[in-house]
């Protein structure tokens, strides 16, 4: 495999901030940081949130690394208390379309299921997001849809 997944470090700050501040790319992420941002220093805000979410057991975020460089993020979050979690993934635009998202997404889904013993991992994507639809379809089973999203599931 071409990638490594590991915890974010202070050395990732610039690349991670760029990823988090990319409004065009993040419209597909389904979350706008401005919802929770209270004016904190943006230079440290995003990594601080990652660390706080981990400490409070709300999420496990992994830096996606290519040759040691942070090129994206994959995470498990929204743990449901019944053995399930939701997964999300985003890749910096200059690395998109090369299969990195699929590789990272599959690795974390399998880690969650087979190492952490989750019973299922779910994900969703906007209907207009062809790249995410292809990524999710390659490693999960489509479970349904509504007007806005396609929903996917992976079980042990």
Positions of PLM-derived features:
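A short helix-loop-beta-strand connector motif used in the catalytic cores of GNAT acetyltransferases and
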Residues: 47-62, 72
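Conserved GNAT-fold acetyl-CoA-binding loop/helix
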Residues: 26-48
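Acyl-donor (CoA/ACP) binding surface of acyl/acetyltransferases
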Residues: 1-27, 61-156
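Hydrophobic residues in alpha-helical segments
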Residues: 20, 29, 53-55
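Short, conserved alpha-helical segments within structured domains
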Residues: 34-38, 60, 128
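Intrinsic structural disorder
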Residues: 37, 45, 57, 97, ...
């Amino acid at each position: 495999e071409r990638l490594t997944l590991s915890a974010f470090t202070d050395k990732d700050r610039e690349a991670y901030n760029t990823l988090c501040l990319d409004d065009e790319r993040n419209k597909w992420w389904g979350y706008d940081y401005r919802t929770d941002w209270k004016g904190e220093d943006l230079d440290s805000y995003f990594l601080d949130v990652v660390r706080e979410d981990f400490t409070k057991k709300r999420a496990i975020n992994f830096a996606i690394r290519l040759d040691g460089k942070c090129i994206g993020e994959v995470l498990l979050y929204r743990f449901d208390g019944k053995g399930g979690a939701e997964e999300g993934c985003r890749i910096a635009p200059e690395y998109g379309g090369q299969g990195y998202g699929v590789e990272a997404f599959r690795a974390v889904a399998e880690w969650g299921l087979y190492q952490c013993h989750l019973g299922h991992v779910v994900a969703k994507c906007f209907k207009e997001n062809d790249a995410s639809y292809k990524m999710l379809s390659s490693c999960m089973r489509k479970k349904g849809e509504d007007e806005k999203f396609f929903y996917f599931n992976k079980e042990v």
